[in-house]
Amino acid sequence: MAAIIPPCSVNGVTLTIRKFTARHFGIEDLIQAGTMERWVANQLENYVLARKNVLIAGGTGTGKTTLLNVLGKFIPPDERILLIEDTSEIHMDHHNLVRFEARQAQNGVPPVSIRDLLKAALRHRPDRIILGEIRGGEAFDLLQLLNTGHSGSLSTVHATSARQALSRFTSCVLQSGVDLPYRAIKANIGDSVNVVIQLERRPGKRFVSEVVQVIRYDADLDEYDFGAVYQCPQEKP
């Protein structure tokens, strides 16, 4: 829930409630809804089982959290998942799931940030780390975990394309204040993020518009090499 009161809200109190459905969607639900084709769904399942690091990108309301929930169902039940969120909103039914949630400073109790939780993550010996959303400097801590060989991670980011998703990741890493060359950060991202799934929303429909594999970062050209897996036809409504 988010609220703005006058004078900042000119026409009176503005209240926005984000209501979560009690129903937890599966991959078949997304296929039936036209979110993706079956072969794309099968490929995404293969990426999770192969422990690829997957980044889900899209604008507000495109279904990033829903897809993250669905992909989490493909994680084998014998693997230990560490789920880290700023605000708890991911509902994952898994036998060995550990949930961490950031905390704001309140009544003299110090805050616990996403960055704090990511730094503590390895002490809990997770097989997979799921970060609800990349928003700021915590991207650097996530990147460090991925660079240490922690495979099979999932996360989301606000972006309008797969290419912009990696640019956004880079910008968030820089927000951490880390003293690393720009191209070194991009090279680390190119080595660590394996797959980007782009989501879009049109009237009455949310769908996967693009799936790419990240091959590498070319420092000479200052660009990423992508392997196209799926591109939504332009005429998609």
Regions found by a protein language model. Name each.
Residues 64:
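Conserved lysine of the Walker
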Residues 9, 23, 105-106, 217:
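Active-site/binding-pocket entry motifs
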Residues 1-50:
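P-loop NTP-binding catalytic core
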Residues 61:
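Walker A (P-loop) phosphate-binding loop of P-loop NTPases
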Residues 41, 48-57, 70-192, 198-202:
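Switch/coupling sub-region of P-loop NTPases
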Residues 187-237:
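Conserved P-loop NTPase
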Residues 5-7, 17-19, 58, 101-102, ...:
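Flexible glycine-/small-residue-rich
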